[in-house]
Each structure stands twice: as C-alpha cells, then as structure tokens.
C-alpha cells in the first residue's frame, strides 16, 4: 500500500479496496521500521492517527465522500497541532503543545485526513539542508550520506521514502521546492495569501507560504484543494475564489508560451542540470508549448535582498521567545536580563542566532535605510521584472537548484555556500508568485528538479503543465533503493 499515490489512495478508499484504518496501520508500521534511517519525523501520532482513521471510515460508511477522506498526511512541525508538540525543530519549543490547530491542519482534518505525525525541519525553517534541527539532520533516501534539502527536509524525505503519500511544507525562500527537487518530488509554493498562515509559526511573515509536497502534480492538486482558501484570521490571506485544481490537469499545452530566463543558465549552474532542463523543455515543446528566451535583469540581487528582509522579519517574529510565557526557560536566572539572554542563547541554535543578529543589525537606526529599505526597493524591482516578463510569456521555466544534493556537513562551515543553493527559488517568494518543482532526471544517482513559475493565482496552470509532463516522463515514478 505504501507505493500508492494520494490519488490512488482516494480511489482505493472509495471502492473499498482497503479501509483508512488498514492503510494507517500499514504506514505507521512502515514509519516505525524505516524512519530511524532517515530521521524524517519529530513526532509520530499513532493513537491520534488510528482514531482519525476509524472516524474517517465511519464517515465513509455513513455515505460521505471526498478525495481526502481517510487519506494520510503529516505536517511540517511548524503548523500548530492541538495537544501535539509543535517544536519548529528547536530546543526553544521542545516542550510546546499548541492549544489550537493551525488553519491548514484544521481544514485537512475537516476533510477527513489522518495525521500520522509531525515532520523534521530546519530550526525555525532557517536552512537549506535540514541540518540545523535540534532533533538531528534528516537523511536523503536517495543517498543517506546526502542532505534532503530544507527547510521542509523531513516532509520531503518521508514522501520520497514512501512512508506516506503526501505532506505539508512551507516555503519562505524555496523550502518546499528545493527539497522536492533534491528528493524527486513535486512541490508547490502557492501565491502569497492563497493558503492561510494562521497557526503557522512565522519565520518571515511577508515571504512564508504553506503548500503541498507529493510525488505527482495530481496529488499536489488534491492536497492544495484542501489547503487553499480565504481565512479571516490571517490578515494577509486573499479572498479569491478557489478553483477546482484537478479539473484542468489534462488541458492542452498547445501554444503555451514558456520563458527561459538567460540569467538562470550562467555561472554556478551544474552543466548536467542545465542539460536535464533543456531535455524537459524539449518534452514540453513536443506537447505544443512555445519556448523563448527572456531576461530577469535584477535576479543577481535576489540573495542579498532576501538575506536582509528575511532575517529582519525573523528578528522581530522571534522576539516573542523570551523564556517568560512559553517555550524554553533557563535554570535559575539571576535577573530578568539573565533570563532573556540565557533562555535565548541556550534555546536557539547557531543558524537562528546568526539570522536574528543579521536582522537586528539591518533594522538598527544607523543601517535601516542602507540595508532594509534598499532590500525592499530591490524586491520591488524583482517583482517588476516578473510582471514585465509575464506580458510576453505564460510561464517561466528553469532549474530548481544549481546543484544536486550535497553531502551532510559539506556546507556547514560556509553558510553562504548553502544560501546560494536557493538562488533560483528565492525570487518567487520576494515577488509572492506561485512556483512548482517537478522531477526532471538524475545526476550521479541524485534527483534534479525543474521549476515552473506563473502569474498570481495560476497554480492550476502550473499543475496542468507538470501533470502533462509527468504523463510523458517517468522520473516521478522512480523510488530510492531500499524504500
């Protein structure tokens, strides 16, 4: 059963080939057996899952239908889950049990999904390798000596290893798309405001967006259907009707205009990945797409702008973790200042502390205009570049990452080397655009992804193109050895 996609599970539950309880039991046993090799889960919620599975079976027996009813899910451990630890991958929240469910968690539970657990992640979603977690690094199922990408590395590794068919992730600078590329999955970052951020522990509030990780575009469409929608509790949620994401998966690509930004194919890109990107372009041309070269002239400024804006927002968001109300508190503080200093110094890991300090510096009185304001101006230029490009093309295509997955620890001593792995994904967050990564082949036995970007609220078009591509290629069907 573990080989089934989310869509196949939906069909199997509908025609009573198996029950949700049987499926849940089988997947929980698989997690117990295989996850020690991967470390993809922080918490496994066995009792909760079996209870939800029985409830889903009862709802189905009473005549209820629904693609997600009784299907399994695991949540990245920054979505609040009522009564279940929500750690954000940090010592700071090791003992935090949220008193409520995040909107995404509540919506999927209402649809009847069964929560198998909470997945490992970079601490406070800060990282591209899932090595900064307080609970240890996650291993890539394609090669256990390599990273799975981050920050949604646990969500990606669990799906790639067939521990379950789909998971939730979040994407602030590529944290859904980059691990999807490095583990042979399909991952979608929706338009900013499409999926509620309420109950999602914030890293950078103007960039964070939740989305699905699965093996196929068809599965991402099903999961996004359950996640998307307006939420009055999130002031940045956008009241835009939610289309049926599965309805147009098979639509023709005849005449679809795809732009290849020349800036994506310069220095830093592994030439073997460039070849795989060109091969995927040829497949889309066979399906009727028209491809042309475009330019995104300000792209080279994206990483510096992002690493001012995101840490600045993080330094503000993470100020609430002070050892007073909830979360980690140091032992026997001498006074209030000592409580703050030691609780934060002991509770946050090195990468989180680094970003808080960078952000605090960028927001300080003498540097605010030179750094933060300048970064926001660059952000506007990057958005304008996309708006201009989309006047002449329907979608933008390029590599998801410049390199395949690297070895565990290889970039730990040089944070900037890891930051550069997000060079192609960051721009979509700065502009708020939807982006999707899909499997496009292998380099040295490690998966490679191709990224598609679309205008606002065009998630359906991204899923359509990825689905048509997956009908004529088989990269997405390949599984890692031993899983």
UniProtKB/Swiss-Prot annotation:
One of its GO terms (biological process) is translation. It catalyses: L-glutamyl-tRNA(Gln) + L-glutamine + ATP + H2O = L-glutaminyl-tRNA(Gln) + L-glutamate + ADP + phosphate + H(+). Pfam families: Amidase (PF01425). Keywords: ATP-binding, Ligase, Nucleotide-binding, Protein biosynthesis. One of its GO terms (molecular function) is ATP binding. It is an enzyme of class 6 (ligase). GO terms for cellular component: glutamyl-tRNA(Gln) amidotransferase complex. Its EC number is 6.3.5.7. The active site is at 76 (charge relay system), 151 (charge relay system), 175 (acyl-ester intermediate). Coiled coil: none annotated. Allows the formation of correctly charged Gln-tRNA(Gln) through the transamidation of misacylated Glu-tRNA(Gln) in organisms which lack glutaminyl-tRNA synthetase. The reaction takes place in the presence of glutamine and ATP through an activated gamma-phospho-Glu-tRNA(Gln). PANTHER family: GLUTAMYL-TRNA(GLN) AMIDOTRANSFERASE SUBUNIT A, TRANSAMIDASE. Belongs to the amidase family. GatA subfamily. Heterotrimer of A, B and C subunits. This is Glutamyl-tRNA(Gln) amidotransferase subunit A. It comes from Pseudomonas putida (strain W619). The gene is gatA.
